[in-house]
């Protein structure tokens, strides 16, 4: 995780350095580029049901994908003017700074560390850290993981909160949630620690695992952007869309569609 942040900081500094030289001849913003292209490029996950996944037809589905379509409609006049780019928790920031996407809508929570290299919209959902175990497990709370092994997904916020709450836990990291889930099932660790909404998606599909009831944090999900003045106009536009869709009840209806509380 530290290597990823160091690399992104370097990329950001290089971009900022180049930007200073171009200020006198270019005032192009990220929103200008989107409007000119007439397509919104959005990074979404495919392994985090019910937020981001492929449906039976192989199409991008979930709350995050639905929000991305709403943003495309608000910016470009049509929810079909969006191109989805699959991302994972470990590669989403790299894809943003490489220019593969204009924004990330992928269960990404706001943290002080991330705010050093990213700008965020206003939150569109609040999750909480939780624990998923095999049924019949002796683990009944986060603290029961002392002296045991827990699984996290690289790029998520789980490792930080887990080490703080359970100093003597052994941590196994995986790149994707399917890999983490498989590791739990075959007994490579005692639990997965992650956002409750993501873990609930796994538990709903398999009655051999269960989600423990307690939540250990608040994780505000927001749309993520490249840090810098080029993103400011785009962020304002997205914030306005989120505010409108929140007040008119559309975001709540989408949450209910996907069984999200």
Could you tell me what each predicted segment is?
Residues 19, 24-25, 65-66, 70-74, ...:
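Extended ligand-binding regions for polar small-molecule ligands
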Residues 19-26, 35-36, 159-174, 207-215, ...:
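Ligand-binding clefts/hinges and TM-proximal coupling segments of bilobed small-molecule sensing domains
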Residues 24-104:
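Extracytoplasmic small-molecule ligand-binding "clamshell" domains
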Residues 27-29, 82-94, 137, 157, ...:
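Short helix-initiation/N-cap motifs at beta->coil->alpha
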Residues 33-35, 133-150, 229:
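Flexible hinge/capping segments at coil-to-helix
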Residues 46, 125-133, 196, 200-243, ...:
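Periplasmic-binding protein-like
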Residues 69, 73, 81-144, 210, ...:
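Acidic, polar ligand-binding/catalytic clefts
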Residues 91, 108-116, 161-164, 185-218:
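A ligand-binding cleft/hinge motif common to bilobed small-molecule-binding domains
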